[in-house]
Amino acid sequence: MSRRVEYTLAPPQRNESDGFDYPDGIPISYNLHRLRHFECEGSYPKYPYGSLVKFYAMVGLHRYNVLEGKNLQLDTLKSFNMRINCGASSYYITLAARVPDSGLKQIFQVLVHEERLGSLDMTCTIARPRVTTNVPFLRPHSESEYDYMDNDELPDWPSEIAFDDTKRFHLVKESELRDNDWIRLYLELTLVAHDRFLTVHYLSQLEIVKVAIEEVEQPNASLNTKTTFVYITYKDLAKAQIGEPVDRKAIVRKIINETTGLLRLRGDYWSGERSVITPEEEYMLLHGGEKVRNNEQRSKKLKRRVGVHRLWRWWYQAYKNRGLRSSSY
């Protein structure tokens, strides 16, 4: 059966750089969306969500480094255009990247689309050296590669016994953690996506304890699509000062398509009290295929989740998943 593909065409008078670098912003288009411009340089720059925009820029460079085999790092944010709407937004970021241990710098453009508010769920579709083009930007709304990346599922936290399976998990050594700063980026972005007003001081008090990486093959994915789950155990030392649990966990799923260049990140975090998969459930997953729970089992799992996250948070999460999704980019 043929697939229908729809496109969003940028306004003709403003298509020369795909939504980047417009100091006057972009007027309201036919779909009632507009871009607002923010400068990040100068003596007293004022722009919203400073940490979030910085991390989005770093994710773009991370994507470029993975696909191109480079090691560029963020030098400075220069400006960004933010799509103004009532839900998830898009960020057209212009930044300066540097090569470590050298004075070389290059201007980059990064485009990030948020899929929802209140949790880490984003797609990076552009990460490139700055260019100008006279070709309008066409974004497919529906295509097979992106449909697979739209899967929202995150796995349950594996049992401690499961982490002993070296064929399934790679336990990151301390030396590897220092050399792979993207792991901390994933953790900090997961928290900031949930609370956009977290300070740099707060984030500095996160202490990573253990990291396990799992590479999986999804049945519906193409050969060029790779899925990685990153399991992070960490201490939130700032929470200790107010009497909350210090030991916490986070899961981040990365999906990257090496052909299209699309990078999707989905993440969540919680205190160490959240229930995990038992050894029996782990055995069922590994040897019995898909789990089938009866109503009583589903009810018990729901009660455990509500007990940890509080009922109001569960309602709020359901509201976000239903209503606050990006309608277009």
Swiss-Prot record:
NCBIfam families reported in the protein's UniProt record: A_thl_para_3677
Pfam family, one: protein_MS5
UniProt keyword terms in alphabetical order: Developmental protein
Highest taxon above the source species: Eukaryota
Name of the protein described by the UniProt record: UPF0725 protein EMB2204
Name of the gene: EMB2204
Species classification: Eukaryota, Viridiplantae, Streptophyta, Embryophyta, Tracheophyta
Organism: Arabidopsis thaliana
Functional summary from the UniProt entry: May be involved in embryogenesis.
Family named by the database record: Belongs to the UPF0725 (EMB2204) family.
Keyword RNA-binding listed: no
